[in-house]
């Protein structure tokens, strides 16, 4: 069994959180990761790298720089059709599986209660190069065969937003800027804003599934 052994890439993390030392205090983080419901607008940093040596994945920090989520793929050569989205202690929050529906591919998120969501690209007859859309169908509708979108992801350049069925913004993800210089930290460092009264573990699971459709993990 692979043992989780976080590696401290100090130079990179200093650029992301210049005011923090690394590694973080895990006992402090453990007390703060639950519940997952946002009480106010919250920001998270998504680092598209794994802390496990020679692995692919991503690492998610809260606004204080505490590690809260991670994805680690121990096969460094390629992704399998099944990916695990975990909390900092390695507890699996969502199992993400790639599905093929005829000519179309989708990613589905499962947890202990069953299928939670399915994400698939919306294909347009006259697509615009500057944008693309994905629909997210939640668990109960997947079981009933209802393909009506519960959420929608709209991608414009380096920014993408998650909206509910009425068009209300739920979350937005974009490249993060340095707190010191204001410079773009690159495609590997993202900032995610999540609106109040939302399950940010579910939002993050959807973001991971979206990144998998674009082979960005």
Curated annotation (Swiss-Prot):
Q: Where are the transmembrane segments?
A: none
Do you know which Gene3D superfamilies this protein is assigned to? LURP1-related
Where does this protein come from, organism-wise? Arabidopsis thaliana
Which ranges of the sequence are coiled-coil?
Answer: none
Protein family membership: Belongs to the LOR family.
Record protein name field: Protein LURP-one-related 3
Mind telling me which InterPro entries this protein's record contains?
Answer: LOR (IPR007612), LOR_sf (IPR038595), Tubby-like_C (IPR025659)
A Pfam family for this UniProt protein?
A: LOR
Role of this protein? Might be related to the phospholipid scramblase and tubby-like superfamily of membrane tethered transcription factors.
């Amino acid at each position: 069994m692979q043992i989780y052994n976080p590696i401290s890439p100090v130079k990179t993390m200093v650029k992301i959180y210049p005011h923090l030392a690394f590694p973080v205090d895990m006992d402090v983080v453990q007390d703060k990761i639950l519940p997952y419901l946002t009480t106010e607008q919250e920001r998270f940093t998504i680092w598209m790298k794994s802390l496990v040596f020679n692995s692919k994945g991503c690492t998610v920090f809260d606004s204080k720089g505490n590690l809260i989520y991670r994805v680690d793929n121990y096969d460094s050569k390629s992704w399998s059709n099944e990916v695990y989205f975990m909390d900092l202690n390695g507890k699996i929050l969502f199992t993400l599986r790639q599905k093929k529906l005829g000519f179309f591919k989708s990613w589905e998120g499962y947890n202990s209660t069953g299928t939670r969501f399915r994400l698939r690209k919306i294909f347009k007859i006259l697509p615009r190069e500057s944008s693309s859309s994905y629909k997210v169908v939640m668990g109960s509708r997947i079981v009933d065969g209802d393909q009506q979108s519960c959420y929608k992801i709209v991608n414009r350049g380096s920014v993408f937003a998650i909206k509910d069925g009425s068009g209300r913004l739920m979350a937005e993800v974009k490249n993060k800027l340095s707190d010191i210089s204001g410079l773009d930290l690159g495609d590997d460092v993202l900032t995610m804003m999540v609106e109040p009264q939302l399950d940010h573990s579910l939002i993050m699971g959807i973001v991971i599934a979206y990144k998998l459709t674009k082979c960005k993990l």
